[in-house]
């Protein structure tokens, strides 16, 4: 079900609707800032939630939402700074998380997220400098990691054990020293497609 490009400012219209069988919900390119209603609804079969290109800054309602079957969460191009609620969110089926083009600097909460099925993590165009939490996270199924256009300087934590299944790694447009970059990248398995700095 798509409500994209309609100048919608809130999700309150969903309150009395029956979405028990709904699998895909799209509210892209609107002017939504408040998603608190998501914590009050029963989306027990929802698999995809698209909320990109809005003005959302507070994602704490995700912590109360029933998203056990959610596979895709796309909230890029918003105003998100704090992702700490992801530690508590019930997103055990998540395979794609897209938080590109926000104002995120601290990704520490990722180390405690239970995203055991996560295949694509996209965080490009934020303000991230420390990627250590990704090393500490249990993302063994991760295939694509986009970290381009951030403020990363140190990638020494990158190793094959972190990325057993990684196929694509994008670190372009960061502040990484070229010599150190080459040393680290050369140690990673050769079949990873790497987008150069």
Which ranges hold each PLM region?
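Concave beta-strand-loop units of leucine-rich repeat
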Residues: 1-8, 21-32, 45-56, 69-79, ...
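A structural signal for leucine-rich repeat
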Residues: 12-19, 36-43, 59-67, 83-91, ...
């Amino acid at each position: 079900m798509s409500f994209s490009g309609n100048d919608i400012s809130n999700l309150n219209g969903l309150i009395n609707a029956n979405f028990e069988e709904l699998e895909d919900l799209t509210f892209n390119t609107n002017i939504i800032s408040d998603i608190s209603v998501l914590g009050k609804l029963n989306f027990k079969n929802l698999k995809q939630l698209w909320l990109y290109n809005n003005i959302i800054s507070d994602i704490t309602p995700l912590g109360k939402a029933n998203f056990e079957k959610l596979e895709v969460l796309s909230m890029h191009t918003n105003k998100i700074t704090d992702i700490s609620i992801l530690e508590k969110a019930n997103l055990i089926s998540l395979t794609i998380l897209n938080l590109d083009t926000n104002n995120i600097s601290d990704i520490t909460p990722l180390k405690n997220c239970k995203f055991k099925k996560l295949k694509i993590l996209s965080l490009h165009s934020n303000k991230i400098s420390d990627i250590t939490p990704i090393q500490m996270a249990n993302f063994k199924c991760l295939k694509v990691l986009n970290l381009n256009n951030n403020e990363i300087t140190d990638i020494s934590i990158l190793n094959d054990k972190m990325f057993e299944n990684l196929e694509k790694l994008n670190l372009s447009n960061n502040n990484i020293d070229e010599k150190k970059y080459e040393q680290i990248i050369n140690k990673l398995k050769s079949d990873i497609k790497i987008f150069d700095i």
